[in-house]
């Protein structure tokens, strides 16, 4: 879970269409890993139509903003960006040129026509379930329409999205995201996901394996399976029956070239025996698990409709660590949910101490329009939220630094991902997701090398290569 913004690198081949030099697209991505994946798939779809990616909106013919709706100020962040683009569009029009502006993602799904009302300079609004219709929607825009595509599609969008070209995948790196599940049926009272991403939908094993094999053939070594509630994945298996995520992981581990597997984000209620067995038996499944709990108070967990108690979460963590003692945990926390008392917050602090997280995200509660939480009374004062968040983040930061320090002296395998900032350096990824910096000018990106951790940096590890 993150509020980071990224942009899609200009990785699309230019020789595939006679129009390739005349249409350029800039994609700005806000929010989670699934939005990054979605932006890549939209870029792949546009590449098939002759669009070339650019790393700046200044020379783009099409600007797509792929939005996130998790945080309170997500919409205002969007409209601020659209205000800047309006000036750019007006300047283009004064020179007799065009700029097409599109809004995608969860804000697009949530607000739809309202975006066109507030920002008339927008030409296209498209929700996550209709990205396969993007080329057709743009054709309608070129015909003079203002297009809003936010209906939930009957057809399977993944069946209609073009596969990425091998060269494009190579340029994206040796680690890749692969969406296997979308939507959520849990309806936590604070969360907009069921309303913006819809009910849970699982891709078939056939689809997932085909995409994973294409990624492996293009040099991908590490796959992270994505879903709003990824461990609720239950797709049609190769034998015709319904599989769970544990079975899927065992199948993906058989693909040549795939050396590492991860998945995110999970719900405690959906950690079943098969998935725990995968953590025990699969060497490719990395010992790092993002398992949000949100609160350590049973009373608040019930108000959030989390469907589990704090002690059930702790027992689950114990089960996982019993089969994988080196497992590191990350989580999400919300402070200041309506009705949260001092004791409720202290229960959260105690749970954090009991789990001892390697990393966690924490936020002040902000009501999201249309969710049950927005209708709750007994709101916590902002000053109290601020104080609680500060205390929680101090504890989580101390745990994070202690976890990093515990790596010093340890030997581990590291997947090399890119050259470092300094000459002769490489940057890799540890099994626990931490970046690892190594003085190494002999190995290549995609190699897995054995190292010893000698010190820590800011959110990174420093290592020496072992013979």
UniProtKB/Swiss-Prot annotation:
GO terms for molecular function: 4 iron, 4 sulfur cluster binding; metal ion binding; N6-isopentenyladenosine methylthiotransferase activity. [4Fe-4S] cluster 2 binds at residues 184, 188, 191. SUPFAM superfamilies: Radical SAM enzymes. Its EC number is 2.8.4.3. Its cofactor is [4Fe-4S] cluster. It is found in: Cytoplasm. Residues 1-20 are annotated as: Disordered. It holds the Pfam family Radical_SAM. Residues 23-143 form the MTTase N-terminal domain. InterPro entries: Elp3/MiaA/NifB-like_rSAM, Methylthiotransferase, Methylthiotransferase_CS, Methylthiotransferase_N, Methylthiotransferase_N_sf, MiaB_methiolase, rSAM, rSAM_horseshoe. Keywords: 4Fe-4S, Cytoplasm, Iron, Iron-sulfur, Metal-binding, S-adenosyl-L-methionine, Transferase, tRNA processing. It catalyses: N(6)-dimethylallyladenosine(37) in tRNA + (sulfur carrier)-SH + AH2 + 2 S-adenosyl-L-methionine = 2-methylsulfanyl-N(6)-dimethylallyladenosine(37) in tRNA + (sulfur carrier)-H + 5'-deoxyadenosine + L-methionine + A + S-adenosyl-L-homocysteine + 2 H(+). Residues 405-467 form the TRAM domain. Residues 170-402 form the Radical SAM core domain. Catalyzes the methylthiolation of N6-(dimethylallyl)adenosine (i(6)A), leading to the formation of 2-methylthio-N6-(dimethylallyl)adenosine (ms(2)i(6)A) at position 37 in tRNAs that read codons beginning with uridine. Monomer. Belongs to the methylthiotransferase family. MiaB subfamily. NCBIfam families: miaB-methiolase, MiaB/RimO family radical SAM methylthiotransferase. HAMAP family: tRNA_metthiotr_MiaB (MF_01864). This is tRNA-2-methylthio-N(6)-dimethylallyladenosine synthase.
